[in-house]
Amino acid sequence: MPTINQLVKVNRKAKTWKTKAPALNRGINTLIKKVTKIASPQKRGVCTRVATMTPKKPNSALRKYARVRLTNGMEVNAYIPGEGHNLQEHSVVLIRGGRVKDLPGVRYHVIRGTLDTQGVAKRSQGRSLYGVKRPKVKK
């Protein structure tokens, strides 16, 4: 605990805050080729690589991810949620923030059911996160 004199000499410093999804906080003005600080909730990008990765201990699986070049010029790794996907190289995807705890370096998620990404087939519960329309009711 500092004394009053110590606080008079040196003020308390506010903690510096660092964003968890830096690629979403950077835009680019293509007319003047300048980086802007306009943040966005999602970004569009093109897949440069679609592959699998093994998670950290103690988990074991083959998690699907895509390397995505965004419209602001950055290249990031994005997790592909759900069972099965149709993504290939050059697929156009929409990404959102949100890390995958057991995959190092993966801080974004691909949004299913938009652009070139199809929704998860035969999904009936928790559909909105996986881009699935409401199934038709049989009479």
UniProtKB/Swiss-Prot annotation:
The lineage of its organism: Bacteria, Bacillati, Mycoplasmatota, Mollicutes, Mycoplasmataceae. NCBIfam families: rpsL_bact. This is Small ribosomal subunit protein uS12. InterPro entries: NA-bd_OB-fold (IPR012340), Ribosomal_uS12 (IPR006032), Ribosomal_uS12_bac (IPR005679). PANTHER family: 30S RIBOSOMAL PROTEIN S12 FAMILY MEMBER (PTHR11652). Keywords: Ribonucleoprotein, Ribosomal protein, RNA-binding, rRNA-binding, tRNA-binding. Part of the 30S ribosomal subunit. Contacts proteins S8 and S17. May interact with IF1 in the 30S initiation complex. It comes from the Bacteria. Gene3D superfamilies: Nucleic acid-binding proteins. Belongs to the universal ribosomal protein uS12 family. With S4 and S5 plays an important role in translational accuracy. Interacts with and stabilizes bases of the 16S rRNA that are involved in tRNA selection in the A site and with the mRNA backbone. Located at the interface of the 30S and 50S subunits, it traverses the body of the 30S subunit contacting proteins on the other side and probably holding the rRNA structure together. The combined cluster of proteins S8, S12 and S17 appears to hold together the shoulder and platform of the 30S subunit. It comes from Mycoplasma mycoides subsp. mycoides SC (strain CCUG 32753 / NCTC 10114 / PG1). GO terms for cellular component: small ribosomal subunit. GO terms for biological process: translation. One of its GO terms (molecular function) is structural constituent of ribosome.
